[in-house]
Amino acid sequence: MKKILLSLLLISSVLSFGAQRVPYEKMTTYGNSNIVYIEGQETPFTGIVEKKFPNGKIEATMNFKDGKLHGKTITYYQNGNIKSDENFINGIAQGVSKRFYENGQVEYEVTYKNQKRDGLERSYSPTGQLQTEIIYKDGKIEGLSKIYRANGKLEGEAYFKDGQPEGITKEYYPNGILRSEVNYLLGAKHGASKIYYESGKLQSEATFKNGVLDGIQKDYTEDGKLIRELPFKYNQVNGLAKFYNEQTGKLEYETIYVDNMREGLSKKYYLSGKLLSEVNFKKDKEEGILKAYYENGKTQGEIPYKNGLIHGTIKRYDENGKVVEEVKYKEGKEVK
């Protein structure tokens, strides 16, 4: 009987030693090492470290083996609810890791493999509503990721490869209707991109090349009328841009752009298609004579420009070609 009692006491002693609890303040590391010791001791720590709030409540418990995190590490809120729950093996994050809101709801959960995220990560709102689903492989986002709205409907989805967007990325309106779709290649926008009205009708379409706009961007009214054509090169408007009347769909204005600035002849049109006015631009400023026309094609007026300012004599004509008004300007100001 005495031998049995002695054996039990020895086992109890060993277990107590292996699970000794030491205050966080007594722990230390030496030099550049991450190995944890009890201050003044030379043997790496094995046991449980406790960290407490100023009021004495437990803030964290950390399991160590041979000076490295090994087993559960749990942190707490002041109210006693768990804040995070992680698992380590020999100092490396392994297995399921969870973080919680103060009300006890899961904030996110993810699986680690050799310190890297690996598998499906889910995040939630404080009420428990699913917010995101992201797949990881060897620490990088891989495959289809999804974002959800507070009402549970899908807000967006994207494919990833080696941590970068690859393929079609989609966004949705709160009613579930597709809002946009963009193609990606090696993490950069590449190929067709489209934006839709909440009705599902096409609003805009453009083309990207290696992350920058390249090609004609077209914008539409909700009833399908083309209202704008912008030629892009290297993410800047370059070439002949056209603007159309939203009611009739007819050409209203056209101008040439060079690196986002108007350069060259710009023209405006009547709804009938007849020329209304024309003027040259230089570095986005009017330069030369602006000519305005009656719908029958006869000259209605002339306005001289210099460096974007009216400079010279403004002339207005009647439909018979007679000058009916002249006003002199100098550097944008009328000369009296």
Predicted regions and their residues:
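Sec-dependent N-terminal signal peptides
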Residues: 4-13
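Glycine/tyrosine- and acidic-biased, solvent-exposed loop/turn segments at the edges of beta-strands
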Residues: 16-336
